[in-house]
């Protein structure tokens, strides 16, 4: 008499998901996904000398104008001139700056029906924030984003800013 043993392949009962690892928080990690992969935007406020004042992280595929007001609300902007590129030319941002007794130098987009005047000589000073971002990219940990949590990534952005200020 022969005994036949049969084996069945049973699919797993547990579905493998991107569950948080031990010690990892499930909070928003400010990581966006696009065709190029995962990415994070660092929004920065700098003073007239190019020194960083405030930082904010967002998903890489979020529009810049969504995070301008939370970034500007971190400091007192009364009596100052806010420089920004065309992405920050939304009416809500301009109204926020006006309501806090500040001026803005933001060029209008090409498709705006009622463009506002821009002092292009003052607008040239916006290169200070671009220079700061180039200095920030010297740090490998920032331009590769090895950190899983946005709190630790933002902490290293602050450390890098301190190192840049001390040079």
Q: What positions do the PLM features span?
A:
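Short alpha-helical elements
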Residues: 1-167
């Amino acid at each position: 008499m022969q005994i036949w043993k049969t084996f069945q392949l049973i699919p797993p009962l547990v579905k493998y998901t991107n569950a948080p690892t031990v010690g990892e928080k499930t909070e928003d990690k400010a990581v966006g996904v696009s065709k190029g992969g995962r990415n994070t935007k660092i929004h920065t406020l700098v003073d007239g000398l190019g020194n960083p004042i405030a930082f904010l992280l967002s998903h890489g595929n979020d529009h810049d104008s969504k995070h301008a007001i939370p970034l500007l609300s971190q400091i007192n902007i009364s009596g100052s001139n806010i420089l920004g590129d065309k992405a920050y030319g939304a009416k809500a941002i301009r109204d926020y700056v006006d309501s806090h007794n500040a001026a803005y130098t933001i060029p209008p987009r090409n498709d705006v029906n009622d463009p506002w005047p821009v002092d292009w000589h003052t607008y040239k000073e916006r290169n200070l924030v671009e220079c700061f971002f180039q200095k920030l990219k010297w740090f490998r940990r920032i331009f590769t984003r090895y950190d899983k949590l946005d709190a630790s990534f933002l902490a290293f952005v602050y450390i890098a800013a301190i190192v840049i200020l001390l040079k």
